[in-house]
C-alpha cells in the first residue's frame, strides 16, 4: 500500500473522540443518526467508538457496523488499547461491518511511559508487534497510533512505527494528543517519519490533533504537504478540552485552495478533481445535527458553519457582495448546503408533502417517527403561518432525536408579571407511569419551571448553561433552547424547540434530566470491576 494516494482520506472521530467533550454523551440511537449523516456526508472512515469502554459503546459500534457499515457505506472503525481484551472487544463489535478497521494505540512519550504506563521502551517495542498481529486476526485493516507522538523521542518513535508496519499495520497515525506542536514542527515530524521509517511506503500516514493552541487545522494542512494522507477530525471540531481538528474547516480549505494543494498530491496545479470524497453540500446539515444532539452550540463566528460565516455588516462589504459575491466571499454558501431556495409548508400541507420535503432534506425516519413528526408539524402549523426548512429541522430534532422518554412533560403553566412572583405548575409522567404535579416560585418564569420540575424528579443537579435562539425571523418564530446540567461531575445536555419559549425550556430541561436519569440507571448495570474508560488519544 502506498502512502501517496492522490486524494485525502477523511477519518471522522465525532462518535469517539468528539463524544468525549463534557456533556456530549449520546444514546445509541443518536449515534446511529449521526453515523447515517456521516455516511451521507461521504466520510471514508467512521470511528464509531471504544467497544471495551462500556456495554453502551460496544452496542453502538456493533449497531453502526450492522446498519451503516454496508458494502456502499464507509469503513467502520473501533478503538482499542494495545491489550488483547480491548482488541477482542473491538473485533467482535465490528463483525457485522462489510469493511472494518481496528485502531490500536499505546503511548510512546517518556512522560507517558514513566507516569501512566510504567513501562520501559523495550517493553513497548515488544507489545506493539504482538498486539498489531493480534488485531490482524480480526481484520486486514489495522491502524496503529503512538500516543503523544508530538512529545515522543523521534528515534524511538521511528522504531515503534517500523515495528508496527512490519507486524501488519496498514495505517500509522501520528497524534498531537495535547495540541502542543506548531505547524512547522508538525510538518517536520511527518517528514522525519517519511525519511527515517524504512517501510513507511507500506502504510498510510494519518494525523490526529487537538486544538489546545488553536493550531490543529493548520498543523494538519502542513502535515498533508509533508506526506500525511489521512486526516482524523470531528464535526464542528468537538472533542476533549479545546476540541479536535474541525472536519468542515479541513474539507473546505482543501476545496477552496485546491490549486495550492494539488501539487503536494502529485496532481496538475489546475486539476479540478475534488481532493476528498466529501459531499460538501451536506456539511451545514451535519453540523446542525451534531450540535443539536450533543448540546454543543456552534459559536456564531465559527469558520464555515457559524451563523455569521456568510454575514456582512460593513456597508462597503455589503455593497461589494451585492454586486459580486466573490468580492468578499471566498466560497459560496450553497457549497456547504446553505440555500435561500426554501419550500414553505403550511397548515394545509399534507403528509405526503411533509414526507417528500423531509426526504429532500436528507432525514431518514421510520413510519412511527414520521407519524410523530407529522403530528408535531401540524401542531406548529396551527400556531405559525409558514413552516420553513429550518422549522422542519427543528421539529424533527425536537420530536424524534431525543433521549429515551423516562420522564414526560404533561403540563406546564406559568403566572408572572411586574408585581407578582413568577410561579410555575408542572405535571410530569414518571418512568413508573404515575402523574405527579408540583409548583414553585422562582426569580423568573423559567427558573420557576425548573424548580417545580426538580421538586418532582428529585435528582440533584446544577444548571450550568442555558441558551435560547430563534430558528427563523418573525414574531411567530420557533425558539430553540439548549441547556447543560452537571450531576456528580458529569454534564448532560438537553434540546427542545417550540413557538412557546417557556414550553421549549421545560422540554429541554426534561430532555437533559432523562439523559441524567438514564445514565444513573446504566451505571447500576456496569460491574464495579469494569469501569467506564475514555481514551486520551
From Swiss-Prot:
UniProt key word Transferase: yes
GO cellular component: cytoplasm
Oligomeric and partner information: Homodimer.
Keywords per UniProt: Amino-acid biosynthesis, Branched-chain amino acid biosynthesis, Cytoplasm, Leucine biosynthesis, Manganese, Metal-binding, Transferase
PANTHER family on file: 2-ISOPROPYLMALATE SYNTHASE 1, CHLOROPLASTIC-RELATED, HOMOCITRATE SYNTHASE-RELATED
Reactions performed catalytically: 3-methyl-2-oxobutanoate + acetyl-CoA + H2O = (2S)-2-isopropylmalate + CoA + H(+)
Alphabetical list of SUPFAM superfamilies matching this protein: 2-isopropylmalate synthase LeuA, allosteric (dimerisation) domain, Aldolase
Source organism (scientific name): Crocosphaera subtropica (strain ATCC 51142 / BH68) (Cyanothece sp. (strain ATCC 51142))
Name of the protein described by the UniProt record: 2-isopropylmalate synthase
Binding site for Mn(2+): 17, 208, 210, 244
The organism's place on the tree of life at top rank: Bacteria
Family the UniProt entry places it in: Belongs to the alpha-IPM synthase/homocitrate synthase family. LeuA type 1 subfamily.
EC number(s) from the headed UniProt entry: 2.3.3.13
